[in-house]
């Protein structure tokens, strides 16, 4: 019989049984070695309020604490929330991690911002602009 993945979708090599965990999203029981695990590190304070909190702080140069959370997803929730993506048959064999997305540069103007030319009108724009009688 053909096989889809070299590891059978699990990380259980030479172990008979692995204890289950609960999915962080739906609560489904899933083997710990099969679950998709992500460690999330983010600021406790949201980006918009960081400056206000630092100005109100008594201590100079106080670094705000971070929030550390380990999330474990079942396969269906990880695919649904785009934590992992479905790959083609040939790309399933690729073991290198996917490239990280580079942050957008702040100096590039965004569409619709001042200083940018308006977008060209489409074919229906002339009909919509004409006055109705």
From Swiss-Prot:
Location of region: Disordered: 86-133
Biased composition (Basic residues): 86-95
Taxon lineage: Eukaryota, Viridiplantae, Streptophyta, Embryophyta, Tracheophyta
Family recorded in the similarity comment: Belongs to the eukaryotic ribosomal protein eS26 family.
Transmembrane segments: none
GO CC term (a single one): Golgi apparatus
Organism in which the protein naturally occurs: Arabidopsis thaliana
Protein name per its UniProtKB record: Small ribosomal subunit protein eS26z
Disulfide pattern: none
Biased composition (Low complexity): 113-133
């Amino acid at each position: 019989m053909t096989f889809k993945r070299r590891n059978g979708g699990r990380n259980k090599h030479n172990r008979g049984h692995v204890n289950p965990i609960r999915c962080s999203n739906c609560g489904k029981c899933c083997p710990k070695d099969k679950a998709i695990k992500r460690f999330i590190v983010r600021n406790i304070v949201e980006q918009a309020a960081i400056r206000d909190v630092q100005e109100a702080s008594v201590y100079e140069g106080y670094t705000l604490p971070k929030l550390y959370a380990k999330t474990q997803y079942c396969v269906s929730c990880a695919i649904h929330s785009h934590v992992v993506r479905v790959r083609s048959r040939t790309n399933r064999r690729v073991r290198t991690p996917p490239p990280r997305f580079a942050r957008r540069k702040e100096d590039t103007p965004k569409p619709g911002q001042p200083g940018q030319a308006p977008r060209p009108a489409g074919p229906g724009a002339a009909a919509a602009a004409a006055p109705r009688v």
